[in-house]
Amino acid sequence: SSAYGVPVILHLDHGDSVERCKHCIDNGFSSVMLDCSGEPYEENVRKVREVCEYAHRAGVVVGGEVMHPVEGKEKFVTAPEEALRYVEETGCDSLSVCCGNAHGMDPDYRKKLRVEEIAAIHALLPEMPLVLHATSVFDEAFIDRANRVGADRRQPFNFALEDLQATYSMGACKVNSALDIKILYTTAIREYMLRHPREMDPRKYLGYAREEIRRHIAGKHRNVFRDSGKSSLLDA
């Protein structure tokens, strides 16, 4: 943090148990998320509330996630009233919501970020930081690059970039994406090995992939998340 002049936190994402969250809290993590969204609502609330009570005594913030199953390929959604009740009953500090941002890539499902639902949640919880998972946005050229080295991927029907960016004024303070990074990392390694098939030094092809990822993430901060150069607005 001091070397780069920006504030840094240590966060546990998608914690899978109360015990793991407590272990991270005891070992210097700034923030933890307990993901019990696949469990019955009452059990989700009970576990996240327990972590919140433990974490808050240590000055650590906690993220929770709530949603319910629905028919169709969207699979899960978060209703505004459900979000309000969950925050009141758990005391969580941030809330992950599912409003069209499904995990994974389904080439047959045209994703649409339901901005109006996020706006409705924000209206009920105007001070609550909202978290969006599974927000990878990429174009046809991105998939074409992967396919040129054997990915055999169809162009996914991702939601529009402008819809994602619209949520930034609706409480979305933390935006997670991983699928694009996974695809690019694998693509870069394949590209390098096709050009250098006799290379056996992992430092070479991993170094190339790491630089591709660095450039990609820097571009996302500037053009997708629009948070580049804003660290001075935060309290260190």
Language model features with spans:
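C-terminal alpha-helical cap/extension of soluble enzyme domains
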Residues: 153, 159-236
